[in-house]
């Protein structure tokens, strides 16, 4: 569902070339950007049925197919970018989640970095949770995100991403939360003056594949596809870092966005009870959660 200059699309083009260079006599890869095949929900359903073989889906959509994906939506699940990368590269963490949708006809084949989600506002700088009080903040259409916003004192306003710019411009909402690229690629920085690095979520996008297609691959073919999936991850992460740097520079120097760096700890302390609530509801996730905490301990800010 991304434009052709987006890191995800660039990574999928690398996958296309890799597969066709090695298996082009049998497989022709076609990449469709910009929701040409429909919404993300439509594409997941098409992947389920085998009408298409792969698609990139957001974690919040996959949560409707498997409660295991609820874990990644938790605010302040990861202590740092390094902890996030280490956890997402750990098969003992991701495999039980990635394989949990097999009964629905698809499974995850790799993760895609979608950055860190932070608050940005039209006119109110966010330094502490108290600054969110009474502000109407657009959140993703997910119960987890609504609860997070309510706990932080803001007024959660779920809406589709395509409606956010107009809502900001017309002051229907006071702000939103997303990564830096929303400021530039989607023009939100033309309306919003402040972007606050509270670092509340690091949620991956997921490349999923149709199970029947994957099962029909020969052993050698599957090995080549697995290399291709790994390439998607590596290329996207590299491109993502460059894209975020460029977005931040444009937002600051062209759009006039002011970047703020509040202490995340007060935000984290307010949201922390959500972790135990989810683990009590889905106890099978607790061992995975504990392994993530090991990554957090190893890669927490300030540790060598």
Predicted regions and their residues:
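N-terminal secretory/targeting leader peptides
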Residues: 1-84, 92, 101-304
């Amino acid at each position: 569902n991304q434009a052709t200059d987006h890191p995800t699309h660039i990574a999928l083009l690398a996958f296309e070339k890799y597969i066709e260079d090695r298996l082009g006599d049998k497989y022709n890869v076609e990449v469709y950007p910009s929701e040409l095949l429909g919404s993300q929900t439509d594409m997941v359903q098409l992947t389920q049925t085998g009408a298409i073989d792969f698609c990139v889906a957001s974690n919040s959509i996959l949560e409707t197919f498997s409660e295991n994906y609820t874990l990644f939506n938790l605010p302040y699940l990861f202590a740092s970018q390094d902890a996030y990368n280490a956890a997402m590269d750990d098969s003992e963490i991701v495999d039980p989640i990635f394989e949990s949708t097999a009964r629905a006809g698809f499974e995850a084949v790799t993760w895609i970095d979608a950055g860190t989600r932070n608050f940005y506002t039209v006119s109110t700088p966010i330094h502490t949770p108290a600054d969110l009080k009474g502000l109407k903040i657009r959140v993703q259409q997910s119960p987890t995100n609504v609860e997070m916003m309510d706990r932080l004192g803001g007024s959660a306003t779920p809406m589709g991403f395509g409606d956010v710019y107009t809502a900001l411009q017309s002051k229907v909402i006071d702000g939103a939360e997303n990564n830096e690229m929303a400021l530039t690629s989607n023009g939100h920085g033309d309306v919003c003056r402040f972007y606050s690095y509270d670092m509340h979520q690091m949620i991956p996008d997921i490349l999923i594949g149709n199970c029947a297609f994957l099962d029909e691959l020969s052993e050698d073919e599957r090995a080549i596809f697995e290399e291709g999936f790994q390439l998607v991850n590596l290329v996207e992460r590299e491109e993502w870092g460059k894209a975020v740097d460029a977005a931040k520079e444009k937002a600051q120097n062209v759009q006039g966005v002011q970047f703020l760096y509040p202490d995340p700890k007060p935000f984290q302390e307010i949201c922390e009870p959500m972790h135990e609530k989810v683990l009590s509801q889905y106890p099978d996730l607790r061992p995975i959660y504990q392994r993530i905490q090991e990554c957090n301990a190893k890669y927490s800010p300030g540790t060598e």
